[in-house]
Amino acid sequence: MAPSLDQQLFFFLNADRGRPWADTLWAVFSSLDFWLPLLIVAGLLIAWRGGFRGRAMLTCLLLSIGIMEGGIINPLKKTISKQRPYHVLSEARVVKLEDTTPRWLAAIRPPVIRAGNPAEAPEVGKSLPSGHTSNMFCFATVLTVFYRWRGALFFIPATLVALSRVATGSHWPSDIMLSAPGSIIVTLLLLAIYGWLWRTLAPRLVPTLAVRHPRLIAPA
């Protein structure tokens, strides 16, 4: 049977091209724990020096990711139960960073690569939606709404992270194609709700702050 278009695209991105540095690069983009220290430092700096807009952005971002993870992504994973590529295809390559301390050393080490194993497939699949893709596009959407074109630049790393999830064998191309726009739509809806709540509740709860900032998301 000929492979589906989804499988063809998967094999194109997941293929071994004889360039270990490319596998390492994709694994770096795909690894949350590699970037976590930098994200924490950036978040603390924005909370400290970012003013009202920066703190509002962080609050909206954390709320949105929490709501999406707990209320949408995880429930959908259990409901859809789509198996990851490496639980379906023995030809799939699973590419991960080496387990190093400190974590940044993994970026200069060869990645750990193994073949897919359908025999290890769990009872409940977790391929759709892609949590990494959803969270990154949520991040990019929030930044764009708060910082306009400067924030929109974050769609570049968000796209690279999404592609890396396919290149490292964790997701099908269709997973990220559905997760990215879905995340943008949900995030925009949540931001609209946050803005309405601020306009409705802030004058009563924090009147002084509401006078200075009548809108949660002010024009850039």
What do these predicted ranges mean?
Residues 21, 52-57, 146-153:
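Membrane-helix interface segments
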Residues 60, 64-69, 73, 97-99, ...:
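Alpha-helical transmembrane segments in multi-pass membrane proteins
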Residues 43-77:
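Interfacial segments of alpha-helical transmembrane regions
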Residues 102-220:
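Membrane-embedded catalytic cores of phosphoryl/pyrophosphoryl-handling enzymes
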Residues 1-41, 72-122, 210, 214-220:
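N-terminal transmembrane-helix/juxtamembrane module of multi-pass inner/ER membrane proteins
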